[in-house]
């Protein structure tokens, strides 16, 4: 499973990249707003930190303007992945971009039917929002399971990029189902390393080591 950081905060991305766990980055208009940075500038900086896909989202709603925005965004760096909404115009844009060799992330997916359309349109990634799905009384992981089954049935190459990840249980469940990628805030990714018994074990080892009076260095 690939790990993408869902953030536009440069320091957080650098910290995660230093661990070797970062495979890519996803951004959206809300994250750009939160960063307080210029969209083009921050996207370019992120692309310089990771060689993996960096999702940058168009904000137009019609195909023609989406294409113009996509042209500007994909000129930033070779690893820019154009993010489009799961609408008919978004799918049309996805098809045009993918036919041209550009990575596309089709976002705001809330049904297996939508995911099927994204794959048919040649999407590199489809982003089902599990947390938001759960918030509205649905089962986000059932959605991931359905998409996995459909994609396996027809050998679609589109990768399932689990988004709106709220906690480490989402990550575990997505991995067990076989999702290709998950994107989450860096704090969620870092939290995967935490376990109370690991901390307790370290404390015990250090206490016993101190009692030996030795030093490795």
Swiss-Prot record:
Its main location: cytoplasm. The active site is at residue 83. It is found in: Cytoplasm. Pfam families: TAL_FSA. GO terms for cellular component: cytoplasm. It catalyses: D-sedoheptulose 7-phosphate + D-glyceraldehyde 3-phosphate = D-erythrose 4-phosphate + beta-D-fructose 6-phosphate. One of its GO terms (molecular function) is aldehyde-lyase activity. It comes from the Bacteria. SUPFAM superfamilies: Aldolase. This is Probable transaldolase. It comes from Erythrobacter litoralis (strain HTCC2594). The lineage of its organism: Bacteria, Pseudomonadati, Pseudomonadota, Alphaproteobacteria, Sphingomonadales. The gene is tal.
């Amino acid at each position: 499973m690939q790990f993408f950081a869902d953030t536009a905060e440069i320091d957080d991305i650098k910290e995660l990249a230093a661990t070797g766990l970062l495979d890519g980055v996803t951004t959206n208009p809300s994250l750009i707003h939160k960063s307080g940075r210029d969209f083009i500038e921050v996207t370019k900086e992120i692309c310089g930190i990771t060689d993996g896909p960096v999702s940058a989202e168009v904000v137009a709603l019609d195909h023609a303007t989406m294409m113009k925005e996509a042209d500007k965004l994909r000129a930033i760096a070779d690893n820019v992945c154009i993010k489009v909404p799961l609408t008919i115009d978004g799918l049309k844009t996805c098809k045009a971009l993918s036919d041209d060799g550009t990575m596309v992330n089709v976002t705001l997916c809330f049904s297996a039917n939508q995911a099927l359309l994204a794959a048919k349109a040649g999407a590199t990634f489809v982003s089902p929002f599990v947390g938001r799905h759960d918030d509205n009384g649905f089962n986000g992981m059932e959605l991931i399971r359905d998409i996995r089954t459909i994609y396996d049935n027809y050998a679609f190459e589109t990768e399932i990029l689990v988004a709106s990840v709220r906690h480490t249980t989402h990550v575990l469940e997505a991995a067990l189902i076989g999702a290709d990628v998950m994107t989450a805030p860096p704090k969620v990714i870092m939290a995967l390393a935490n376990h109370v018994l690991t901390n307790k074990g370290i404390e015990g080892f250090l206490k016993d080591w101190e009692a030996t009076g030795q030093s490795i260095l």
